[in-house]
A protein has these predicted regions:
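Conserved G1/Walker A P-loop phosphate-binding module
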Residues: 1-59
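P-loop/Walker A NTP-binding module and the surrounding RecA-like catalytic core of P-loop NTPases
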Residues: 4-8, 12-20, 64-72, 77, ...
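C-terminal effector modules of nucleic-acid-centric enzymes and ribosome-associated factors
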Residues: 3-6, 122-128, 134-137, 149, ...
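Conserved Switch II/interswitch segment of TRAFAC-class P-loop GTPases
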Residues: 52-53, 59-64, 76-102, 106-129
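Conserved nucleotide-binding/hydrolysis micro-motifs of P-loop NTPases
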Residues: 62-63, 90-94, 110, 119-124, ...
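Conserved catalytic network of the ASCE P-loop NTPase/AAA+ motor domain
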Residues: 10, 37-39, 45-50, 71-80, ...
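Conserved catalytic-core segments of large NTP-driven translation/proteostasis enzymes
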Residues: 120, 137-283
């Protein structure tokens, strides 16, 4: 299975496109359906012409919900070959949140994508050409500069089959099924007769009923047991990467688990509260605010930034997180609706700083 995240400006047709590909409605909340506006993460799945299963994480496009968008994109960005479905309306062209979502994708190092010029039925030939030229200009100089572009109308069906073929062509490296599990939780809820269920994107390792896992939370780390597994609305005996998976946990209340908590293989992940990072994209680290929100996986936590220079800084996390060298984080200002910078972890156990003013 591949897991693909959507991206793009609000009201450019991301959810409508996912529904056209899967026949499933990704918007889960009544308010989303009433307003025609995606607020939180949505999920759907289908089978591509090759027979490969693919799941979609549909993210909100409105700037007010950038944090929710990053919670959907972040776990996929930590996988071996993340894939993006980047949507730009052919009748409107590139917009503000198009740039914000591109900044996030570049910060996470995403290189595999298909750009969709959506709402093709509403655009004349000149508008389509202008939108395609805009996309080329905006993607130039980024890892997504050479990705395929497909014109699609989810209303008439134009281009939908071509889009399926383009998605089928995104072949990446095989994930590691024997790696340690690190499942970033994006939902937690209770089902009558089953109990607590959490969901997330499994990008490495395998899960089986009966497994014991470590649950990283703001309050500490505790052990939990896997009672059962579901994927694509069906019970499974083995979850392998990359896949969307629902994990039924034994002996813990759903209300105590939150987005950004992490299920891991016991003893395989060190908890870090202080990490050193280097800038990969965005603003220099010596000019951003000292207090920012860092997005890693599905978590968004306030961190203190101690810059060493324009390219390097130390981040103080509010609670221990299972972070490894090479992880990519996105930084944004508290309450801000734009990405400040992307950083890569270079040390998860750095030496103490003894210079005056540290802290």
């Amino acid at each position: 299975m591949q897991v693909i995240a959507t991206a793009g400006h609000v009201d450019h047709g991301k959810s409508t496109l996912v529904k056209a590909l899967t026949t499933m409605e990704p918007d889960r909340w009544e308010e989303e359906k009433r307003r025609g506006l995606t607020i939180d993460l949505g999920f759907a799945w289908t089978t591509l012409p090759s027979g490969e299963n693919v799941a979609f994480v549909d993210v909100p496009g409105h700037e007010r919900f950038l944090g929710n968008m990053l919670a959907g994109l972040g776990p996929i960005g930590l996988g071996p070959a993340p894939v993006l479905l980047f949507v730009v309306a052919a009748d409107e062209g590139w917009q503000a949140q198009s740039s914000d979502h591109l900044d996030a994708a570049v910060a996470l190092g995403i290189e595999r994508a298909v750009v969709v010029l959506s709402r093709a039925d509403k655009a004349d030939a000149q508008q389509r050409a202008n939108a395609a030229a805009q996309v080329q200009r905006e993607l130039a100089g980024t890892p997504l500069a050479q990705v395929p572009v497909v014109e699609v109308s989810a209303v008439t069906g134009e281009g939908v089959d071509k889009l399926r073929e383009a998605l089928d062509g995104l072949v990446g490296p095989e994930p590691d099924p024997v790696a340690a599990v690190r499942l970033w939780i994006d939902r937690s809820f209770s089902i009558t007769g089953a109990g607590t269920v959490v969901t997330g994107t499994l990008v490495a390792g395998t899960l089986r009923p009966g497994d014991t896992l470590s649950l990283f939370q703001a309050t500490g780390v505790r052990e939990v047991e896997v009672r059962g597994l579901h994927s694509e609305n069906a019970a499974i005996d083995l979850a392998q990467p990359v896949s969307r998976v629902a994990v039924n946990l034994r002996g813990i209340d759903a209300g105590t688990i939150h987005r950004g908590d992490v299920l891991t293989t016991p003893g395989k992940w060190e908890a870090a509260r202080v990490i050193d990072v280097r800038r990969t994209t965005g603003r220099n680290l010596d000019v951003i605010p000292q207090e920012v929100v860092a997005h890693l996986g599905s978590a968004g936590v306030g961190v203190h930034v101690r810059p060493f220079d324009a390219q390097h800084a130390r981040l103080q996390l509010p609670e221990p997180l299972p972070v490894v060298v090479g992880d990519r984080l996105i930084l944004r200002g508290p309450g801000a609706r734009h990405v400040l910078a992307g950083v890569e972890v270079i040390d998860v156990a750095p030496p103490e700083l003894n210079r005056r003013g540290e802290g």
